[in-house]
Each structure stands twice: as C-alpha cells, then as structure tokens.
C-alpha cells in the first residue's frame, strides 16, 4: 500500500525533476540561452555536486551500530538521492547550452559569455572550502575510523555549501531578469514546478517527523539542510513569479539585446 510519505516523495521528486527540462527545451526551441544567467547555472551546478555527495554518504555510508540510535539519522530517502543526481546531470546539460551553445547546440551568435568576477570568486572559494573539508574528512576517517557524527558534520557542511550556493545563485538570475526587463524565453513552467516540489518536500519532512521523533531543536539541526533548501527555493521562486507578472507584458525586442 502506498503511504502519504511515498506520495509526497513522488510528487516532489517528479516536480523538481521535470522542472529541470523547461529551461533546456525553451533554450533549444528559441536557439538561445540568453534568458539564463551564466553565474546562476555555474553556481547551481557546483551546489548540486556538493548535495549529491552529501546525500550519498548519509544514505549509503551511514554506519549502523548498537550504540547509536537510528533516530539521529537525517530523514533522507532514495527519492532525495536520485532527484539530486538527476538534477546535477541536467544542470550540466544546461551549462553546455549557456557556455557552449554555439559550438554544441548550434545556437546562432558568436558572443562569449563570462562569469561576473564576484560570483567567480565565490565559486572558487566554495571549491576551495569543499576541498579542505574533504581532505580533513578523509584524513580523520583514515586515522580514527569511520564515525557517524563525523560523517554528519561533513555532510552538514556540504549542505551549508549547497544552501550558500542556492542563496547566491538566484541573485544573478533575478538581476539578469531585471536588467533585461523581460521574461521572454524564461521557463516560468519550471518555476511553478519548483514551488510544487518545495512544498511537497517540506510536507514530507513534517509528516516523517510527526510519525517518528516529533519536533525539537535536535531534529531541526539534523534535518536543517532539507528545510533550508526548500525554504530558499520557495522564496526565490516567488520572486521569479512576481518578476514574470511585472515583465511578461514587455515586448520581445528587449530580450534580443542580450544574445548568447
């Protein structure tokens, strides 16, 4: 029998997974990725990479012992992992459209897009932090054996990196939309699917906790990554929706000023 937990998991994974396709399809149909900020897609790809590693470790490398309660394990499912892996791969595809649209996708235009220097520094800083955290994690496990508390600390740090990327990545996209003063070629369908997935993800977590250990500061700390990602996604997607209502009546000529 399918439970409410499974239904919510299917809804959020399906919604978030499908939301990856409108940008790619829209860019392909219009032969341009001008509506997508390069800073956004670069930061998003890095963030998804951190998230995939974090969820993989928590799902498949969690050491079950008699001394530690399974209640301390973050409430993650197979849905979370496969959604994130799929999202990471789709972001790589979107990245090829933005970075190499003319060469790979045969988009017209010869312009070369570059990252904003500030966002490039942020990306490089996050990669440096990720490298340091990973070296420290591997060193500790090599000398002091594998321990769940150490794994959780490392995974939460990766979640923090992902949340940081999510907080920052939307800013250049919001700015990009504002600069163009147009939502032409912007995949608003993906935004609505994102909102649906974010709400379903939060409802699933609430349902899981209400049937398990209940709500407390400890459970929030343990699951703050999932809560944080859902809230950030919802907040910025509502901003995109407001921009869409403001700019949707603008003409298509403004968007043409920003070719690939």
From Swiss-Prot:
It comes from the Eukaryota. Cystine/H(+) symporter that mediates export of cystine, the oxidized dimer of cysteine, from vacuoles/endodomes. Residues 1-67, 162-212 form the PQ-loop domain. This is Cystine transporter. The chain crosses the membrane at residues 7-28, 40-62, 81-102, 118-138, 151-175, 185-205, 227-247. GO terms for molecular function: L-cystine transmembrane transporter activity; symporter activity. The keyword Transport applies. It is a multi-pass membrane protein. It is found in: Endosome membrane; Vacuole membrane. GO terms for cellular component: endosome; endosome membrane; fungal-type vacuole; plasma membrane; vacuolar membrane. Its main location: membrane. It catalyses: L-cystine(out) + H(+)(out) = L-cystine(in) + H(+)(in). Keywords: Endosome, Glycoprotein, Membrane, Repeat, Symport, Transmembrane, Transmembrane helix, Transport, Vacuole. Glycans are attached at residue 177. GO terms for biological process: L-cystine transport. InterPro entries: LC_transporter, PQ-loop_rpt. Belongs to the cystinosin family. SMART domains: CTNS (SM00679).
């Amino acid at each position: 029998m399918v439970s409410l937990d499974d239904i919510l998991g299917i809804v959020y994974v399906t919604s978030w997974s499908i939301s990856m396709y409108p940008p790619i399809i829209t860019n392909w149909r219009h032969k341009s990725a001008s509506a997508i900020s390069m800073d956004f897609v670069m930061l998003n790809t890095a963030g998804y990479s951190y998230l995939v590693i974090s969820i993989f470790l928590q799902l498949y490398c969690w050491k079950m012992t008699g001394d530690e309660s399974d209640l301390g394990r973050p409430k993650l499912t197979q849905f979370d992992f496969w959604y994130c892996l799929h999202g990471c791969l789709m972001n790589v595809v979107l990245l090829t459209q933005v970075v190499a649209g003319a060469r790979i996708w045969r988009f017209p235009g010869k312009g070369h897009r570059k990252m904003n220097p500030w966002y490039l520094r942020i990306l490089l800083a996050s990669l440096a932090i990720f490298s340091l955290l990973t070296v420290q994690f591997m060193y500790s496990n090599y000398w002091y054996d594998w321990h769940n508390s150490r794994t959780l600390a490392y995974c939460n740090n990766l979640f923090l990196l992902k949340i940081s990327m999510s907080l920052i990545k939307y800013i250049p996209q919001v700015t990009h939309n504002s600069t163009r003063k147009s939502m032409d070629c912007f995949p608003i369908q993906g935004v609505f699917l994102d909102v649906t997935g974010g709400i379903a993800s939060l409802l699933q977590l609430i349902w899981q906790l209400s049937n398990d250990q209940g709500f407390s500061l400890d459970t929030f700390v343990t699951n703050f990554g999932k809560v944080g990602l859902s809230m950030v996604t919802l907040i910025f997607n509502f901003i995109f929706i407001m921009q869409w209502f403001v700019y949707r009546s603008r003409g298509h000529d403004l968007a043409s000023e920003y070719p690939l």
